[in-house]
Amino acid sequence: MGEVNVASSDETIVKVKDGIMIAVSAGEAVIRAKIGKTSAETNVIVVADATAEQVNGFGEEYINIYGRSYIQEGRLNLDQTANAVEIGIGGGNLSVTLSSTANSYMRIYIDESTEGKRLNIPVGIRKYMLASELEEGYHKIRLAKATEMQDACWDVLAFEADRFTCVREKSDLKIEFIGDSISVGYGVLGDFGQNKSVENSDCTKAYPFVAAQALNADYSIIAWSGICTKAYHWEKNINMAELYKHVSFTNTEEYAFDFSPDIIVINLGTNETSYLSRNLQYADRFLADYYGFLKYVREKNPESYIICLYGMMGVNTLIGGGIEAACAEMDDEKIIYNPLVIKSDTSAANGHPAASAQIEWGKELADFIEK
């Protein structure tokens, strides 16, 4: 039959000696075997074991955390929309004990799943099974908070597993999303004519999460239903100019701005459209408000590309024109106004965009970013 030649694509990860694979460091390599004209290859993932104490210390050398978060009294606080945690295990079971301030929902993604499993998270402290009886070998489990910040906040107390491993590092691509109800998946699972509810809302079906998932990107979403850039309309005590400065709505410490996103996507102006209909004089003020916020975002993120979107629930020319003028006034080649061809949609609950439209926008945004 002849001699079988076995080689590794990266000997800093895996070496092959006398036909035996030897792990060198964490990472991924391709092992290729060839005999005569026949060949085969397989991917090999090398991960280090982790202890329960390491994982439950919530350090990102052992787990991945998505979105602004903080640790308080030994608990990992997940307030933000679509906050997520990725855990690595070596097969078997994984559970989490967490506390929720209100009825909410989670999506659980195992390995390369993109749809995930939706799980109801009632108010209070409970233990939840995230994965069970997985075959031996490395598995990545992501739990994502599918409910927006103003409806529920979570505290993670502890994870339990048969065998923890260090999770593989996140993507180098980082995207920050700033928005309103569109960005949180408000009513996205509901039908036109229905009222919005926690049950028919899901931020994992909104375009920011869809785009980040399509790009396998690290992400952070700062969004709040009903919010304006600086005006107070549906929300009487909060605007994005203030919310963006803080870790979260419940943790008002000044945010460190250490995420350093490659790309920032701002989607504001929809609530100002409604506000303007009741406060006509605001037309003269909006440009200055949006420009001031855009300038602050640039100040805190000097190297990021900034994409300003508008029109997913219809267009008011005064608002759209104000956003475009603010972008032009910045005179910054890394600030881009509305690069997508957006077809507005109001076919879901309370006249908000449906999942089908959100998914399409997310994919279009991902395609634009890739190009």
Language-model regions, residue ranges each:
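Extracytoplasmic soluble-region selector
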Residues: 1-53
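N-terminal secretory targeting modules
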Residues: 47-178, 182-200
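Conserved SGNH/GDSL esterase-like catalytic core that processes O-acyl groups on lipids
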Residues: 82, 149, 188, 193-280, ...
